[in-house]
A protein has these predicted regions:
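Alpha-helical transmembrane segments of multi-pass membrane proteins
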Residues: 2-227
Length: 227
């Protein structure tokens, strides 16, 4: 793959993080409110409920949770295959851009589907796959390493960054950037979830067009940040 040069200011780093986390927050909220009270990006709770439903012999509910977990997992793997395919052909493409294009197309398509019967499960697993794809595509944004589809690890990293003791001015600057980035991730997830909840009340599943629009903005920024 032809090396990609990144041209991303600190402000663009923060905005990209905010957009990606708002996307995930809105998708997760919409899935929870419209598709049976299940999350598609936060797998810790799904794992706990998978175990609970197994213990209670609620086999279909357990299978739903397991399907979401495996779909998120397969989204991560898909993104890795996309990266490998681009690299093997020496294509001058940005893998993150490809993943965002896929994500936007999927969200737009799902916004116009029904939520009844087996199609509801198909929507859940497809959204989970999309979140896995996004999270792997943006393991780092500029110099910041974080998750954009779920935030438990980001909150942990935020605590570590706040409690750290920088040895010099450069380390202090790096810590400040990490703190702002990780705090932005959490706040944006909250805002995204609010957008998803409000959109769900007004537009039902068509509110998936809200995160799709945010993906388009993130895509435009990604195209500007790299050549």
């Amino acid at each position: 793959m032809v090396p990609l040069t990144e041209r991303r200011s600190t402000r663009q780093v923060y905005l990209t993080i905010a957009l990606l986390c708002a996307i995930a927050g809105s998708v997760d909220a919409l899935a929870y409110l419209r598709l049976g009270r299940l999350f598609v990006a936060n797998l810790t709770g799904n794992t706990v409920f998978f175990a609970y439903h197994l213990a209670e012999r609620h086999w279909l509910s357990a299978l739903e949770r397991l399907a979401i977990i495996l779909s998120f997992f397969s989204g991560v793997i898909t993104d890795r295959f996309v990266q490998r395919w681009i690299a093997s052909g020496r294509r001058a493409w940005n893998p993150a851009v490809v993943s965002l294009i896929i994500e936007c197309g999927v969200l737009c398509a799902l916004a116009f589907l029904s939520t009844y019967g087996s199609l509801r499960v198909a929507l859940l697993v497809t959204l989970a796959w999309t979140m896995g794809l996004q999270n792997d595509a943006f393991q780092t944004v500029g110099p910041v390493s974080l998750n954009t589809a779920f935030i438990t690890g980001d909150i942990q990293k935020l605590g570590i960054a706040i409690a750290s003791q920088p040895a010099d001015e450069q380390a202090t600057k790096k810590r400040r950037q990490q703190v702002i980035s990780l705090a932005t991730a959490w706040l944006a997830y909250v805002v995204g979830a609010i957008l998803g909840a409000v959109g769900s009340q007004t537009f039902a599943l068509r509110a998936l067009l809200i995160p799709a629009a945010l993906v388009l903005i993130a895509l435009a920024m990604e195209l500007r940040a790299r050549n």
